[in-house]
Each structure stands twice: as structure tokens, then as C-alpha cells.
From Swiss-Prot:
NCBIfam families named in the record: 1-PFK, lacC, PRK13508.1
Pathways per UniProt: Carbohydrate metabolism; D-tagatose 6-phosphate degradation; D-glyceraldehyde 3-phosphate and glycerone phosphate from D-tagatose 6-phosphate: step 1/2
GO MF annotation list: ATP binding; phosphofructokinase activity; tagatose-6-phosphate kinase activity
Disulphide connectivity of cysteines: none
Lineage: superkingdom: Bacteria
GO aspect biological process, one term: lactose catabolic process via tagatose-6-phosphate
Organism of provenance: Streptococcus sanguinis (strain SK36)
Chemical reaction(s) catalysed: D-tagatofuranose 6-phosphate + ATP = D-tagatofuranose 1,6-bisphosphate + ADP + H(+)
Class of this enzyme: transferase
Gene that encodes the chain: lacC
Protein name according to UniProt: Tagatose-6-phosphate kinase
Coiled coil, from the record: none
Length: 309
């Protein structure tokens, strides 16, 4: 089983408007509400490709109940309830623009933080791969992901960690290492305090720095240029075909789903990289975030090339 972790989920609300009028009433005829958060995007994609997946994280209030009701029926809900209400994230789509209003979300108490650690530990026996995605809610220390990764490692589970900023830096500087991370160029630049380009020789040098020691897989998305990856001491360049991009949001989460799935199936290097990239591309071809059309899987998969560099 693959266990996904979303510590700060949301209800994503979309308001399409022809024009956003300031300081007056705006009426919306169509409203879209979906269970949101990076980890839940991963969860949806894993369910759509037929993997055995369960979802955990923190939920609360009426929004938490809505989130549970809107999970794919193939997903086992193993969430931990908190006193605060799961947040709303509002996107106003207007005049080919997108204005977002994001709630900070609930503040987690010490008892809730400790309670989730015990809950998480109880799930390790039935998991093989743990996929941790997104930001930490208020109240949790920046080192919280270190504790989750350590619990999973002690249980012998593989861990895919997709976060950024201080939370990622804390894990990388600790003695506890995830199996795989998926930083982009911007996140690499932030971690190292200098600009990192898409040049392959530079990426090879960057991923060989001591900060990344002990991590089995590092996969860097290069957008339309594919991806660059390091598996232990072997480097790969992934080339992808050109596609019609409809909505790129969630493609990184779909890539994480591919990494997690491939690890759970003990795939070889080339198969892992192709699966990760094809799912990211399939998401980009869909209007809905965290969704793939599996009918197009084989066609795109066969057009992806992976070479050792």
C-alpha cells in the first residue's frame, strides 16, 4: 500500500467571473469545490492508475467532512481529526487571470501534533511507500517532517518527500533521509542560496553537493525540457515529447504519484523515470488538477527517452 500524507489540506473553491469588480458585489453562477492539497492530488492520481492507496493527514470541522465525502471511493481514508476547521483556498478566475485567496488554516496544538505522530506510526505496518507532500500548518515545528520520515524509515518504508523551504532544508540537514525528493530549479536555488540553471553539468555538480548525501533518488523537473535525475551515483536525462498543455497545475504532484507507484512496484530506473514523467504530462493535458487520462498513458510513455549522462 502507498500512504499519502497531507498535513495542511484544503477545500479548493473556484469562482469563474467575466470581470472581477472591486468594492462591489460579484455574483457567481458556477462554483467548483474539490478536496485540495498536494498530497490529495497525489492520492487521486494513484487511485486513477489503480494503485492501492490510503490517505492520511489532519482534517477538522465541516470542511474536513466535505473532504472525506469527496475522496475517490478507491482511497482508504485514514485521517486524524483536529479541533480546527480544514481551510478554504479560493481561486477567482477572471479576464484570463487568477486571483487567489488562501486561508492559513488551523493552528495545530501540541497534543494534536503528538497524537498524529502516534497515529502515523500505527499505519506503518500496512504501508510500503509513504508520500509526504505540501506545507506544514501553523503550530507544527519546521522539523516535524524529520519525525515523520524517521518513523517511516524505522518501519522499513520508502519515503517520497515533496516540500520546499525551511521544512525541506531541515530534513536535508538532518541525519534522517527520505528515499526520493523532487525539487525544481527554483527550490534548488533557494536551498543553495545561488541561482541554479538547467545546464546538465551544473545540475550534476549541484546534486553531488553534501547537502544531498544519502538520498537515493533526486528528480529535477525541467518543464518542457523533461527532467534530470540522480539515482545514487548515476545521472539520467529524461526527454519528453511536446504536448498541448491545458493546465500544468498539479503536474508535479502527478510526478510524485509516479515516483511513489514505481517504488512500490520495485521498478527499474528507466521505468521509474518514464512513469513519473508520463503522469506529470497526462495531468498537464487535463483541465482538472490532479487528474490523468490513463487511455493516453502508453502512447506518451513510449515517446519518453531516458539516457545515462
Amino acid at each position: 500500500m502507498i500512504l499519502t500524507v497531507t498535513m495542511n489540506p484544503s477545500i479548493d473553491i473556484s469562482y469563474p467571473l467575466e470581470e472581477l469588480k472591486i468594492d462591489t458585489v460579484n455574483r457567481v453562477s458556477e462554483v467548483s469545490k474539490t478536496a485540495g492539497g498536494k498530497g490529495l492530488n497525489v492520492t487521486r492520481v494513484l487511485a486513477e492508475i489503480g494503485d492501492n492507496v490510503a490517505a492520511t493527514g489532519l482534517i477538522g470541522g465541516t470542511n474536513g467532512e466535505f473532504l472525506l465525502q469527496n475522496l475517490n471511493q478507491a482511497v482508504r481514508p485514514l485521517f486524524y481529526n483536529i479541533s480546527g476547521d480544514t481551510r478554504n483556498c479560493i481561486a477567482i478566475l477572471h479576464e484570463s487571470k487568477q486571483t487567489e485567496i488562501l486561508e492559513a488554516g488551523p493552528t495545530i496544538t501540541v497534543d494534536e501534533a503528538n497524537g498524529f505522530l502516534h497515529h502515523f506510526k500505527s499505519l506503518m505496518e500496512s504501508a510500503e511507500v509513504v508520500s509526504i507532500s505540501g506545507s506544514l500548518p501553523a503550530g507544527l515545528p519546521v522539523e516535524y517532517y524529520i519525525q515523520l520520515v524517521e518513523i517511516a524509515n524505522q518501519a522499513g518504508n520508502k519515503v517520497v518527500l515533496d516540500c520546499s523551504g525551511a521544512a525541506l532544508e531541515a530534513v536535508l540537514k538532518s541525519d534522517v533521509k527520505p528515499t526520493a525528493i523532487k525539487p525544481n530549479n527554483e527550490e534548488l536555488s533557494q536551498l543553495l542560496g545561488r541561482e541554479v540553471s538547467k545546464d546538465l553539468d551544473e545540475l550534476k555538480a549541484v546534486l553531488s553537493e553534501p547537502l544531498f548525501d544519502g538520498i537515493e533518488w533526486i528528480i529535477v523537473s525541467l518543464g518542457a525540457d523533461g527532467a534530470f535525475a540522480k539515482h545514487w551515483e548515476t545521472f539520467y536525462k529524461v526527454d519528453i515529447p511536446k504536448i498541448q498543455v491545458v493546465n500544468p497545475v498539479g503536474s508535479g504532484d502527478s510526478t510524485v504519484a509516479g515516483i511513489s507507484s514505481a517504488l512500490s512496484h520495485q521498478a527499474d530506473d528507466v521505468s521509474l523515470l518514464k512513469k513519473a514523467n508520463v503522469l506529470g504530462m497526462l495531468n498537464a493535458q487535463e483541465k482538472m488538477t490532479g487528474h490523468v487520462n490513463v487511455e493516453n498513458y502508453d502512447d506518451l510513455y513510449n515517446q519518453i527517452t531516458v539516457k545515462e549522462v
